Amino acid sequence: MLISKKTLGVLIPDIFSFSNDQIAQKLEQMGIEVESIKQFNSPDYLQLAKVVSIQPHPHDNKLFICELQIDKNKFINVVSNANNINNPDNINKFVIVAKKGTELLNGLIVKTQNIKGIISEGILCSYIDINPFSRQIIEKTEVADAIIIDHVSNDHDWNQYLSFLSLDDVIFDVKTPTNRADLHSLIFLAKELGVLLKTKTFLKQKSSVVNHDFFKFPLNLKNKLKANYFGGLFLRQINQHSSPWTVKGLLINQMIKPVNYYVDKANLVTVFTAQPIHCHDADRIVGNIELKQATHNETFVGLDDKQYEIEPGDIVVCDEKGIIALVGIIGSKRTMVQPTTTNIFFEVVNCNSETIKQTAKRFLINNFASKFMVKPISLLATDNCLNYLQNSLLTTDNIGKISHFSSSLKVEPFSKKLTVNFHKIRQLIGIEKKELTDQTIKKSLSQLGFKVDNQLLKIPSYRQDINTWQDISEEIVKLIDINKLKPIGITSSFNFEKSSYFNTFNALTKLRKKLQTLGFHNVITYQLTDQKSAKTFNLFNLENFITIKNPVSQNHSVMRVSLIDSLLKVLKTNNNYKNELVNIFEFSFIKTQNNSELHLAVLWVEKLFTSSFNPMQGISNDVFTMKGLAKLIVANLGFSCDFEPLDDSDYFVNNQSLKIVVFNEQIGFIGLIKESLLNNYDLNNKPIYCLEINLDRMLSSLNRIEKNYLGYSKLQPVCKDLTFSFTNPASHFDQFANMIKRITGIESWKLISVFETMQNNQLITKYTVRYFLKNDANKPLTNQTIELITNNLKLQCEKLKIKLDI
């Protein structure tokens, strides 16, 4: 979930007086996990400019010469091909200009240019020029449009353009607790956050327009599903236009695609209330409108131009011609709001979330609406939605154009009652009465929306997570901050002993951080799986599986004996939801009836250290880099490893897989997964390398390692670097490794870099090796000896047709 600080500022006006870290701390205190805080980095030399004149280019009818005022007495000419610039109404409006010397985020450096005989001293910026990462969210028609700003105050600093695009915003990327669907609503979230920040909140939005003049809702709606609510508002005789860039920017910041003025308003209302709204062109609706469950198979075309196969049981909204919306998922193309639309029906539904969840899962959809509708939505959230929508539409231009609600919604403010004992709450928290009085508890709960009558507590209707008095204790802890509670030691009749040799937890923590630094993402998956999956990727040939008696489902009936299958299912799920695939790893115990051992598994899917500006950059996944990764993991635990061939594997491609061996004992595998297996996970479109290691055998050996310490040599170590590539594609790095071991005078070597580069229009993989020469105190190295060793190494490389970078 993305939280915009500027959007939150509508409900908590003082939010900008708090630092981002303070807000993040309070969100964490609420039980919300803050994953990242994002701010926009603006390029230098961008500023607002006033359009003075627009003239056609004398030599190209697709270009226009714009005279711009960039300061009180400074003017420049800019040649532009923006689709929307040639309009007399743009005179005296403002644009954003990138002046000479600007380096845009897409890598473009702006220079003064002669464009067909006219000097251009900059470029008019489109939104993509300033924020290239939003390309997938912007309408295609706006990609080539210049940003036009209607009005800028006389005292505004023209160098400060970010606020007009809402790029001065801060975005908190968060995860809400699974039992707090209400926190998807910014209104409910702001209520709690305001209490923790000890500042005022304004949760009821009211229009400044006094004369409402609402008309009777004109459509005939039938709630055949008997849903909690089915209805909405009607807006008539409107003129369609785009939203201002301040609104578009807010939506883009939260990964919502701007559409037009009224649809954007509805989407912002959804952000505030967590109640999705479908917008329909009312003139395209035929006859009565029904909310119902589909009774037979049928198809309809959605807003995204895709055909959807509706099955019996799916919840749909229909008119007399057919389906106009798949509830909580997507509207139909037939009734979508278009530039010519003059009458809009804003449809709001509150119904069974479980059915919508199953439908969304079948269609592999995880869009803006379904994220909210797959969880229960309180009636209070629906009521907030209707009121926010009506007030947001209520402008002086729309007086007499907005209907009453189609039907009234009766909302009970409180859903249940609990009897609480304040003394028990203090005991559970571990705090004295003088530190937390009864009055303080009552005041705190009242601020959070609870109604307190002595020890009888009324629970707000949107708080479905509150069921026992212990849940109330959790609410109190949030307010007093759990970090401020004094720790109380655990009384025990025995002492915990800490190993003086090694701390396994620290070793694994260090290894986890190392993998995360390299760009791998830590995941946690289920221990239980089905019979078929349990036998897939049984790399260690384990037997005596643990089976569950009376399992919840057959999909969770057996304890897994490998982590690879679980990780591939993670990639499959993300791939189905069109999420970008990343490299992942997991630590987990593999349990059988005989044993329990700690394993580490890694899936390498994409290049490491890539750049969005240079896709060629990065380290590719191949068997050589997998060997390096395996060595790094084993070395992190204080061991070294060797590799042995793996023949006729059921899981890996031949010549692309190896056994990992430590002290002549096989501890794991690396390899390229066979495409036939990846077909089962819908992942056969790219190579996936995997690694699985039994860490238990190494960890149990750590305390019995004997170490020999050698004194430092008085002689300075001698090392040299060598960069090379293979001229023969069939060559292997192992050929170089075997050769360099045989060179007299070379004590050791290590691979320090692998990179790809273009050479003669061909992608070449290059390797850089650092080798160390023996420098014996009895026979120190001379320049002549070093040269002999180096020349011998070069000669051996030539024999193997290894091309050196000299």
Swiss-Prot record:
InterPro entries, sorted: aa-tRNA-synth_II/BPL/LPL, B3/B4_tRNA-bd, DNA-bd_dom_put_sf, NA-bd_OB-fold, Phe-tRNA-ligase_IIc_bsu, Phe-tRNA-ligase_IIc_bsu_bact, Phe-tRNA_synthase-like_B3/B4, PheRS_beta_core
Compartment(s) of residence: Cytoplasm
Record's catalysed reaction(s): tRNA(Phe) + L-phenylalanine + ATP = L-phenylalanyl-tRNA(Phe) + AMP + diphosphate + H(+)
Superkingdom, natural source: Bacteria
Listed EC numbers: 6.1.1.20
GO molecular function, one term: magnesium ion binding
Stretches assigned to the tRNA-binding domain: 40-153
Cofactor binding note: Binds 2 magnesium ions per tetramer.
Cofactor: Mg(2+)
Name recorded for this polypeptide: Phenylalanine--tRNA ligase beta subunit
